[in-house]
Amino acid sequence: MPQPDSVKARLAALDRIDDELCAVLQHAQATIGALAELKRGHAALQPQLEQHVRDYYRTLEHSTVALRNEIRELDAAVGTQLLPVNIGKRAVGQDQEKLSEQLAQMDKYVGSM
């Protein structure tokens, strides 16, 4: 069953956000690695550490904004595309009957011990 274009667009946007979040983790790893080397006395890595930190925050900000926009888009879609959904409740009372049946079986089992 083919998906509507709006769904394809949302999935593509979420895929890009996922890639950006992976990049955030890679920048965090590079930042921590550079910081560890800097603590070991490699002072020449200071500019590299600063660049990793800038990349981390830039990517984090971009992915956060994109995710917030997708959430806003989903909120808008809920009111227009997804709802109203008619839900007819069926089998009313079966859950209570099943619960009573299970409790009776447990009473029999516990009583026979």
UniProtKB/Swiss-Prot annotation:
Alphabetical GO biological process terms: regulation of transcription by RNA polymerase II
Principal subcellular localization: nucleus
GO cellular component: mediator complex
One of the Pfam families matching this protein, by short name: Med11
Any one GO molecular-function label of the UniProt entry: transcription coregulator activity
InterPro entries assigned: Mediator_Med11
Keyword Nucleus attached: yes
Subcellular location(s) of the protein: Nucleus
Keyword line: Activator, Nucleus, Transcription, Transcription regulation
Subunit record text: Component of the Mediator complex.
Function: Component of the Mediator complex, a coactivator involved in the regulated transcription of nearly all RNA polymerase II-dependent genes. Mediator functions as a bridge to convey information from gene-specific regulatory proteins to the basal RNA polymerase II transcription machinery. Mediator is recruited to promoters by direct interactions with regulatory proteins and serves as a scaffold for the assembly of a functional pre-initiation complex with RNA polymerase II and the general transcription factors.
Family according to the record: Belongs to the Mediator complex subunit 11 family.
Protein name per Swiss-Prot or TrEMBL: Mediator of RNA polymerase II transcription subunit 11
Organism field: Eremothecium gossypii (strain ATCC 10895 / CBS 109.51 / FGSC 9923 / NRRL Y-1056)
Biological classification of the source: Eukaryota, Fungi, Dikarya, Ascomycota, Saccharomycotina
Designated gene of the protein: MED11
